[in-house]
Amino acid sequence: MEANTRSTGRLPAAFLTPGSSSFMDFLSDHQPELLPGKRQLPPTQGVIEAPHGTTIVAVTFPGGVVLAGDRRATMGNMIAQRDIEKVFPADEYSAVGIAGTAGLAVEMVKLFQLELEHFEKVEGAQLSLEGKANRLSTMIRSNLGMAMQGLAVVPLFAGYDVDRNRGRIFSYDVTGGRSEESGYAATGSGSIFARGAMKKLFRADLSEADATTLVVQALYDAADDDSATGGPDVARRIYPIVTVITEDGFRRLTDEESSEIARSILERRLEQPDGPRAALL
């Protein structure tokens, strides 16, 4: 890309060339080496040790969707970080929760946020929720080379569909394959345990308060059986990140709200360590 000439004050030609409304396409055309998936890694032997984010969960309710994540990052058998943030707003009506290689995942989220903002500025309107999910799918697919070297990124995407007036959840695989989930979803190392908990507790008529409690219950169950997932840490005042997306937009629960939910669950678990029980019939 040509450097901006200070004497004339002109923008580089790349900025004046007509193209698509995708910022990723712009980078791909003019500076592809800046895209995460285009970087060449040196040859390595064995698995690359890097911090990994673990468990993300999401659940819908009649007014929207809740997306939440634990706070632990691991590196092999070690705890790399106890208070990592894994849930981020993508734009006003959507959010992304990251699992997989933490550094690459955070970089991908930042690029995704920029992609959505760039599209809105160029087109004068937001992408549909389906369109946002497709853009994220393309970004994950571009990371396939890294994934083949053990640096996979597997996010969970959720948002409020203003056209359909409901919350929706999209999951992905390492190749960028996209699936829309019904009711609830989980990704990451503790996802199998979180999904099992949500399967027994989910109802179509959940209130927002019930939905936020459900995701923390699911993360607690995941932490109970998966060492890479962190449960509520009362001593350090570290609690799951819980976000809610409705017709009013994205909102992250305050630390006080999250701690209140977590503490109420911990108190109940003193009597029922395995959590709430679903009816047999």
Curated annotation (Swiss-Prot):
It holds the Pfam family Proteasome. It comes from the Bacteria. The keyword Cytoplasm applies. The keyword Nucleus does not apply. Keywords: Autocatalytic cleavage, Cytoplasm, Hydrolase, Protease, Proteasome, Threonine protease, Zymogen. Gene3D superfamilies: Glutamine Phosphoribosylpyrophosphate, subunit 1, domain 1. Residues 1-53 form a propeptide. Pathway: Protein degradation; proteasomal Pup-dependent pathway. GO terms for biological process: modification-dependent protein catabolic process; proteasomal protein catabolic process. It is an enzyme of class 3 (hydrolase). It is found in: Cytoplasm. One of its GO terms (cellular component) is cytoplasm. It catalyses: Cleavage of peptide bonds with very broad specificity. Its EC number is 3.4.25.1. The formation of the proteasomal ATPase ARC-20S proteasome complex, likely via the docking of the C-termini of ARC into the intersubunit pockets in the alpha-rings, may trigger opening of the gate for substrate entry. Interconversion between the open-gate and close-gate conformations leads to a dynamic regulation of the 20S proteasome proteolysis activity. One of its GO terms (molecular function) is threonine-type endopeptidase activity. CDD domains: proteasome_protease_HslV. The active site is at T54 (nucleophile). HAMAP family: Proteasome_B_B. Belongs to the peptidase T1B family. Component of the proteasome core, a large protease complex with broad specificity involved in protein degradation. The 20S proteasome core is composed of 14 alpha and 14 beta subunits that assemble into four stacked heptameric rings, resulting in a barrel-shaped structure. The two inner rings, each composed of seven catalytic beta subunits, are sandwiched by two outer rings, each composed of seven alpha subunits. The catalytic chamber with the active sites is on the inside of the barrel. Has a gated structure, the ends of the cylinder being occluded by the N-termini of the alpha-subunits. Is capped by the proteasome-associated ATPase, ARC. This is Proteasome subunit beta. It comes from Streptomyces scabiei (strain 87.22). The gene is prcB.
